[in-house]
Amino acid sequence: MPLEMEPKMSKLAFGCQRSSTSDDDSGCALEEYAWVPPGLRPEQIQLYFACLPEEKVPYVNSPGEKHRIKQLLYQLPPHDNEVRYCQSLSEEEKKELQVFSAQRKKEALGRGTIKLLSRAVMHAVCEQCGLKINGGEVAVFASRAGPGVCWHPSCFVCFTCNELLVDLIYFYQDGKIHCGRHHAELLKPRCSACDEIIFADECTEAEGRHWHMKHFCCLECETVLGGQRYIMKDGRPFCCGCFESLYAEYCETCGEHIGVDHAQMTYDGQHWHATEACFSCAQCKASLLGCPFLPKQGQIYCSKTCSLGEDVHASDSSDSAFQSARSRDSRRSVRMGKSSRSADQCRQSLLLSPALNYKFPGLSGNADDTLSRKLDDLSLSRQGTSFASEEFWKGRVEQETPEDPEEWADHEDYMTQLLLKFGDKSLFQPQPNEMDIRASEHWISDNMVKSKTELKQNNQSLASKKYQSDMYWAQSQDGLGDSAYGSHPGPASSRRLQELELDHGASGYNHDETQWYEDSLECLSDLKPEQSVRDSMDSLALSNITGASVDGENKPRPSLYSLQNFEEMETEDCEKMSNMGTLNSSMLHRSAESLKSLSSELCPEKILPEEKPVHLPVLRRSKSQSRPQQVKFSDDVIDNGNYDIEIRQPPMSERTRRRVYNFEERGSRSHHHRRRRSRKSRSDNALNLVTERKYSPKDRLRLYTPDNYEKFIQNKSAREIQAYIQNADLYGQYAHATSDYGLQNPGMNRFLGLYGEDDDSWCSSSSSSSDSEEEGYFLGQPIPQPRPQRFAYYTDDLSSPPSALPTPQFGQRTTKSKKKKGHKGKNCIIS
């Protein structure tokens, strides 16, 4: 009996265990999980939770439990169902809420059912993912969706937010299952501020969301923003004032708030106003809007040059090139002769060209442009129009004499050392012999006749020619070389160098017209390589300013001009002139030796009669050139140009003031004795040589038109032309001593009629000019005016200011003397 009862007892015990609610694994499941699906056996519960992500399984005191609570509040907002959870509903709105909640529950609310599919079910498909659900697996069914519709446990999610439906609670709408939140939003808008359903008739819609009218306000000051401007920050609205005070960025340039009304530029966490003033180069202040820029150390620059802190535009202040101190490294590099082609060209253009058109500033594109900017443009124009082929000049190897190492080392003055050490070494070349001179005269005369038509073709107007280089400015900044870093002389220094040239300048007058064009800056790009004229003064002045040798690619080319040049170029257009209003002749051919050698070759036996010096009015400077400039060299250095000439220095009492010279005593001497005189008197030769011969009206120069002169050249042999040159009366033997200024003057014949008639003369330096064309002062004293009944100033008759380029070279001799303060210019105003 006991043996028979054992299986029955065990079966009863098993049945009781299965039917007991406390022992049916449900007790264990309730203790392990915060929530379990109702009506499931323990193994079915295990199968269900096994289908869910581990972090979403609601174990007790687990992240899954916290996630469940969060989802309950989110998916089933209590204020969507209960009036007590709402903040400020009117009575009407409360009734609407109750009706709304009851209707949703009645029409859409449901709970999903977990079922274990029988193995006979072969065609169950998940409604969400569309995959097959095999027999023996658990599936979720929704009664509102229909009996045959099922989902994988992990696919039973809200159609809108794609989150697992917490506790399997769903709302069915239009064939889709939703959580309680998104189902309510399908029916009524939800306020983004209070998260409640909006039952009022009016609401504010912004940013794709809805607000109660009174809830759409600034998050900071709670100002109602309905119908006003606002700014959204992290999904919250702000009024413009609060946003600027809390979140507005500061401009890196001006330091002010970037207002909501202003566009801004942002780069690497930095902000700028999107204006030309703020978003600009930190160095040159050029606007960078729409342009590439170079960021460096929190600043933005337009180019590499500006990022290095250098000013591309030279300063226009007085003597800026000499007042700016150089670093030791730059001095060392200068002494090593480092130089670039573009830098040398830029510096030379600065030395050669004055300020543009002081009488007609309207011709300039921008009247506020600095002088150095325009000078750089001119140098770029030379470079852009192929002034001279590099191979052409490199092929012309010139002999250079070795420098004397002791000459420059004996002086402590830095500028003097640079002048002596890096001066043009070709200056000491011997004078060309007579055969070379005659051959070159014939060659140049033929060449000038051939090139006359070419010059006419290339003769553009002043505005189009002089300013055509502006287009190259932005592209050529990096090509300026040393000149971009401030080592080139400023315009004030250029004026001073022109005054140094002036000291040795002859003041003979050329009655040509084309000489204006040949000597002007505009002609540089038109000249052929064989016509290109370079003065060794360029090298001397470059050495004074930069200390850089210009012997390499910028070697001076000797070029000989005969009188045919001056006579041939008579009737050309005088449109192109610069504004240098003084006799700015070069030092090149002004020594007594070169004049003597020239005169001995052209007219070997003729001795000039002694005549009284002529008294010529001088061109006067403009107001812009009236500031006195001074280059200080060592007072103890005087280079007499390798000639055994006795140099006398004036006493100390006479060095600080300008002196008055009388030329009558010098007019009574033969020019063969002038070699003994000082540097000052040597520059006076040009004045005296022109005046030592008196001409009758019948002996004056016959003027040829271009057509007549070409016929004359064709009909004459070389010797007849040479004889004609020697008999050219106005210039005589000393054509090469004439000034660089050809004067086109309707009153020239009146002047020639009075040639050499005055007895008294006086000379005054014109380094500082008058304040106007009518009266002038120097050092507080009025400059005496020429008698108006005799002749008029030439500048009154000029169509435009005269040019200021050096004369063509004759040999390579020049004088590198350092001028004393008392021996400034020798431009003479003679009454």
UniProtKB/Swiss-Prot annotation:
List the S-farnesyl cysteine lipid attachment residues: C828
What InterPro entries does the database record attribute to this sequence? LIM2_prickle, LIM3_prickle, PET_domain, PET_prickle, Pk/Esn/Tes, Znf_LIM
Expression across tissues? Expressed at highest levels in placenta and at lower levels in lung, liver, kidney and pancreas. Expressed in thalamus, hippocampus, cerebral cortex, and cerebellum (in neurons rather than glia).
Tell me what happens on changing S799C: Probable risk factor for NTD
The entry's function note states: Involved in the planar cell polarity pathway that controls convergent extension during gastrulation and neural tube closure. Convergent extension is a complex morphogenetic process during which cells elongate, move mediolaterally, and intercalate between neighboring cells, leading to convergence toward the mediolateral axis and extension along the anteroposterior axis. Necessary for nuclear localization of REST. May serve as nuclear receptor.
- Modification Phosphoserine occurs at: S315, S591, S594, S683
Q: How does it assemble?
A: Interacts with REST.
Q: Where is this region: Disordered?
A: 313-342, 663-688, 763-831
Q: Which family does it belong to?
A: Belongs to the prickle / espinas / testin family.
| Keywords, ordered alphabetically | Cytoplasm, Disease variant, Epilepsy, LIM domain, Lipoprotein, Membrane, Metal-binding, Methylation, Neurodegeneration, Nucleus, Phosphoprotein, Prenylation, Repeat, Zinc
- Name of encoding gene: PRICKLE1
The disease tied to this protein in UniProt is: Epilepsy, progressive myoclonic 1B: A form of progressive myoclonic epilepsy, a clinically and genetically heterogeneous group of disorders defined by the combination of action and reflex myoclonus, other types of epileptic seizures, and progressive neurodegeneration and neurocognitive impairment. EPM1B is an autosomal recessive form characterized by myoclonus that progressed in severity over time, tonic-clonic seizures and ataxia.
Q: Which GO terms describe its molecular function?
A: protein-containing complex binding; zinc ion binding
Indicate what this protein is called per its UniProt record: Prickle-like protein 1
> Where in this chain does the record put each LIM zinc-binding domain?
124-189, 189-249, 249-313
Q: What is the effect of changing R104Q?
A: In EPM1B; affects interaction with REST
The entry's stated outcome for I69T is: Probable risk factor for NTD
One GO cellular component, as annotated: postsynaptic density
| Reported effect, T275M | Probable risk factor for NTD
Spell out the Basic residues composition-biased ranges: 669-680, 815-831
